[in-house]
Amino acid sequence: RVLIVDDEKMIRMGMKNAIDWKKLEVDDVFTAASGNEALKILKEEGPEIMVTDIQMTEMTGLELIKAARESVPELRVIVLTGFDN
């Protein structure tokens, strides 16, 4: 089970649809547009892996990782970023 977190819908849906999750033996892929939405999904659905952007408006990816690890210490995290500087 994987959770994709990004405040840009095109990125979220692109990752969800472009990756062959079944080939990777992933049964469920959840998406969240914000850190708060991601924390709710983590508690309700229990994904093992979270892919998150760093630059988000409501809560940064680093803040999300810290909060997520407090409730799910064994969570594996993949961090993405796309800024130029």
Regions found by a protein language model. Give the residues of each.
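Active-site residues of response regulator receiver
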Residues: D6, D53
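Conserved active-site segment of CheY-like receiver
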Residues: D7, V79-D84
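Two-component/phosphorelay signaling modules centered on CheY-like receiver
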Residues: K9-F30
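Acidic, metal-coordinating helix/loop segments flanking the phosphotransfer/catalytic sites
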Residues: K16, T31-I49
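Acidic catalytic/metal-coordinating carboxylates
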Residues: S34-E37, T60-E63, T81
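Short amphipathic alpha-helix used as the core "switch/output" element in two-component signaling
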Residues: K40, L62-P73
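His-Asp phosphorelay/catalytic-motif detector in bacterial-type signaling
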Residues: G46-E48, V72-R76
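Receiver (REC) domain active-site loop signature in two-component systems and cognate sites
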Residues: M56
